[in-house]
Regions:
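Glycine-rich active-site loop/lid that clamps phosphate-bearing ligands
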Residues: 335-366
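ATP-binding N-terminal substructure of ATP-dependent carboxylate-amine bond-forming enzymes
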Residues: 1-104, 135, 363-378, 386-419
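Active-site "cap" helix and flanking loop/linker of ATP-utilizing ligase/carboxylase catalytic domains
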Residues: 2, 249-271, 276, 286-343
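Short amphipathic alpha-helices in soluble, non-transmembrane regions
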Residues: 176-178, 345-348, 393-402
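ATP-grasp fold ATP-binding core
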Residues: 118, 143-164, 182-201, 206, ...
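Conserved ATP-binding module of the ATP-grasp superfamily
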Residues: 124-127, 147-150, 164-200, 231-237, ...
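A short beta-strand motif that forms the metal-chelation/ATP-contact edge
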Residues: 208, 279-288
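A conserved helix-loop-beta module that forms one wall/lid of the active-site cleft
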Residues: 93-160, 179, 183-184
Length: 420
């Protein structure tokens, strides 16, 4: 019996590519790699089984897949990030494959449309105001006071998200977000600037899989570090969550509700929420899995990799993840604290020797130009740890991080060391 064939949309600079390809190999899935790379370069490099597609033009990409594969249609086309999810939806629709529609995916990917979706579902949501690029920001009257949050409608994670505490910071924050969008070609035309109420409370995340319109929760994460701004730097994720059962249930129900209402009925979802007392307010629900290398922390929780879970579902195989171990696990994302040219991370041997540390992956490469938030779109690396409790995991991650030093060369060429 032939292996199921799957088209994977792999951004050329994604952390996740290798983990998805490894999972596919382990499951015996025949993968056709599709990348946003030049056709001529792909041929020159001798990349086999690869489609070079324009990820910024989903309709054209879908036509190219049909032309190149002919009647040998795959069982599914799967994206591994935000942009890939939208492209995959368009390709699946044109090929007649069963999947979430492009409209369903777009409703979740756009943060303004997501807020309207929450309101339609009568779920807690902050007030939000969109505005056009030519609007006089200094004359803008908000229906709510400070603090507020300025953010782009279509960038992922914390990129371009800025807390504003007083009126004289407002114009600068909006200008900053506009500048970020001008330099982000993939969303520049389709993204707007949003201003919304700041939400107090702790921040948490959910990893799940929609199966037949029902949410299957794979993990709930706590974020021990306060996310209060002015920029919202992701650092530590730990699980299992310490949230009360009724709060967890509210979080899960809200995620399922908005997914069903949008029409996202199948596939991975990653959700973020603010929790203030018993009130759960979703920040976003993305039709993709968790970003970076963070998924690696879930192998203990699931008994297999998250990528294997996603691929099992994509090819129509039922799954029953079984935890490989009890206890707690976590990841720390190493943020960029100074802009410049990345050189190296020091203290790695000492950090890896901290009891409970499982691995440290430095993903930045020597010579990479790096930027801190709000412009940042990448991390320097990831620390993974496990222990008996989430608190112990958090302490382990902090101890390992404290031994590291980051050397970043300013663009002028003078070395500077940033110690975590």
């Amino acid at each position: 019996m032939p292996s199921p064939q799957l088209v994977l949309l792999l951004p050329k600079d994604s952390y996740r590519n290798e983990d998805f390809l490894t999972a596919a190999s382990r499951l015996g899935v025949d993968v056709i790699q599709a990348k946003n790379q030049c056709h001529q370069l792909a041929d020159y490099w001798g990349l086999e089984q690869m489609l070079a597609l324009p990820f910024d033009d989903p309709q054209r990409a879908a036509r190219m897949v049909r032309e190149q594969l002919g009647d040998a249609l795959p069982v599914a086309v799967l994206g591994v990030d935000d942009q890939g999810a939208e492209v995959a939806a368009a390709i699946n629709q044109i090929l007649g494959l069963s999947a979430n529609t492009p409209e369903a995916v777009a409703q979740l990917r756009d943060k303004y449309r997501f807020r309207k979706l929450q309101m339609e579902c009568r779920l807690p949501a902050p007030q939000v105001v969109p505005f056009a690029g030519d609007e006089d920001v200094s004359a803008m009257k908000l229906p709510f006071g400070f603090p507020c949050v300025v953010k782009p409608s279509r960038l992922s994670g914390s990129r371009g998200v800025i807390r504003v505490d007083m009126s004289d910071q407002f114009v600068d924050a909006v200008d900053c977000v506009k500048t970020i969008l001008r330099h982000e070609a993939s969303v520049a035309e389709s993204s707007s600037v949003l201003v919304e109420q700041y939400l107090p409370g702790s921040e948490h995340a959910l990893e799940g899989l929609m199966v037949g319109g029902r949410l299957r929760v794979l993990a709930l994460f706590d974020k021990p570090d306060p996310m209060e701004g002015p920029y919202f730097e992701e650092t530590i994720y730990v699980c299992p969550s310490g949230l009360r059962a009724e709060v967890q249930s509210s979080f899960e129900q809200q995620v399922e509700t908005v997914c069903r209402h949008a029409g996202v009925l199948e596939g991975p979802v990653h959700a973020e929420a603010r929790i203030d007392g018993a009130t759960v307010t979703l920040l976003e629900v993305a039709p993709r899995s968790i970003g970076g290398l963070c998924a690696r922390m879930l192998r203990h929780t699931l008994g297999m990799t998250l990528e294997e879970v996603i691929l099992h579902h994509a090819i129509g195989q039922s799954i029953d993840p079984a935890p490989a171990s009890t206890g707690a696990t976590g990841v720390m994302m190493l943020p960029v604290e100074a802009g410049g040219v990345f050189d190296r991370v020091t203290g790695l041997d000492a950090a890896r020797a901290v009891p409970g540390v499982e691995s440290i992956e430095i993903t930045a490469r020597k010579g990479d130009r790096v930027q801190p938030l709000p412009e940042a779109s990448t991390y320097l690396g990831f620390i993974f740890a496990s222990a008996n409790t989430p608190d112990e995991v958090t302490a382990t991650l902090r101890q390992a991080d404290a031994t590291l030093g980051v050397v970043i060369n300013p663009l002028l060429g003078v070395d500077t060391t940033v110690v975590s």
